[in-house]
Amino acid sequence: MKLSFHGQSTIYLEGNNKKVIVDPFISNNPKCDLNIETVQVDYIVLTHGHFDHFGDVVELAKKTEATVIGSAEMADYLSSYHGVENVHGMNIGGKANFDFGSVKFVQAFHSSSFTHENGIPVYLGMPMGIVFEVEGKTIYHTGDTGLFSDMSLIAKRHPVDVCFVPIGDNFTMGIDDASYAINEFIKPKISVPIHYDTFPLIEQDPQQFKDAVNVGDVQILKPGESVQF
């Protein structure tokens, strides 16, 4: 299995001969190294509806015929408003099996909407974190979130091999809360900081996060770099 980071919160997972992308913010992402014209995926998984996560989902889903997995509201919106054919709606606490592995959505403390060109936001369900089980490994993508103690319950139920955690502050946890979450609640084997440096408001030094974490290993990935098992 291979996990690649592509800026902001975009993660590319390759496992069981399938390709999965999380939060495909590609075209307007100054930190993304991917090209929307050449990306190949079988599944697209969404944590929530904000532009820097919802990103290129419509174009990518139509181009690749990938199945989009997200909240029930996002699935309905993509199907009815954008004509995306392959959608799989879920909600917090739900788990579903796919041919690459399983997806379970868990709690995240954030918000979730998509703003149309007319300036009106569309509610797209609850924000969520994702627990993947692929090839015997557990990956926890926290999504955009603040710190909450039930991260420890998530990790107790699903001991985490790799955790992708936001450190950008302002909209999500910053370095202090993110490192606390890793040290006290999640305790993964590998931590990967995400959701930072894409915009001025979330500029951070990931080395400070690495220095603050005292459990497992911290991998600071540049866009295009990966963790492989």
From Swiss-Prot:
Pfam families: Lactamase_B_2. InterPro entries: Metallo-B-lactamas, RibonucZ/Hydroxyglut_hydro, UPF0173, UPF0173_UPF0282_UlaG_hydrolase. The keyword Glycoprotein does not apply. Keywords: Hydrolase. The keyword Hydrolase applies. NCBIfam families: PRK00685.1 (NF001911). This is UPF0173 metal-dependent hydrolase SAR1785. It comes from Staphylococcus aureus (strain MRSA252). The lineage of its organism: Bacteria, Bacillati, Bacillota, Bacilli, Bacillales.
